[in-house]
Amino acid sequence: MFLLYEYDIFWAFLIISSAIPVLAFLISGVLSPIRKGPEKLSSYESGIDPIGDAWLQFRIRYYMFALVFVVFDVETVFLYPWAMSFDVLGVSAFIEAFIFVLILILGLVYAWRKGALEWS
């Protein structure tokens, strides 16, 4: 017997949480005034007249640092529940978490050797 009624709250939440942003975009698209002109295409600098061209290319030096940080920050999300239930899970969970951390350390060493942590 297929017990779909157990997940009714989940499906209702999923449908409502998906419909709210879609409806917000649709309503704003229908109700917003459409005025095209040079003011809409100009850059905004805190109420001051723009000076120069706002479309210039610049290098982001911290991109690789941010990327490595995000990878190792997400690791914390996976390790925190394991640490909270460490005493219940036993030795096999410890070995699995150790392998997980070892893979992350190998990734850090790889990023280090590739120069992702250099300031160049």
UniProtKB/Swiss-Prot annotation:
Location in or out of the cell: Plastid, Chloroplast thylakoid membrane
A Pfam family of this chain: Oxidored_q4
Keywords, comma-separated and alphabetical: Chloroplast, Membrane, NAD, NADP, Plastid, Plastoquinone, Quinone, Thylakoid, Translocase, Transmembrane, Transmembrane helix, Transport
Transmembrane segments annotated in the record for this chain: 9-29, 64-84, 88-108
UniProt xrefs under InterPro entries: NAD(P)H_OxRDtase_bac/plastid (IPR023043), NADH_UbQ/plastoQ_OxRdtase_su3 (IPR000440), NDAH_ubi_oxred_su3_sf (IPR038430)
MF term (GO), any: NADH dehydrogenase (ubiquinone) activity
EC number: 7.1.1.-
Membrane topology of the entry: Multi-pass membrane protein
A Gene Ontology term for the protein's cellular component: chloroplast thylakoid membrane
Enzymatic reactions: a plastoquinone + NADH + (n+1) H(+)(in) = a plastoquinol + NAD(+) + n H(+)(out); a plastoquinone + NADPH + (n+1) H(+)(in) = a plastoquinol + NADP(+) + n H(+)(out)
PANTHER family tied to this protein: NADH-UBIQUINONE OXIDOREDUCTASE CHAIN 3
Family under the similarity heading: Belongs to the complex I subunit 3 family.
Protein name (Swiss-Prot/TrEMBL): NAD(P)H-quinone oxidoreductase subunit 3, chloroplastic
Organism: Capsella bursa-pastoris (Shepherd's purse)
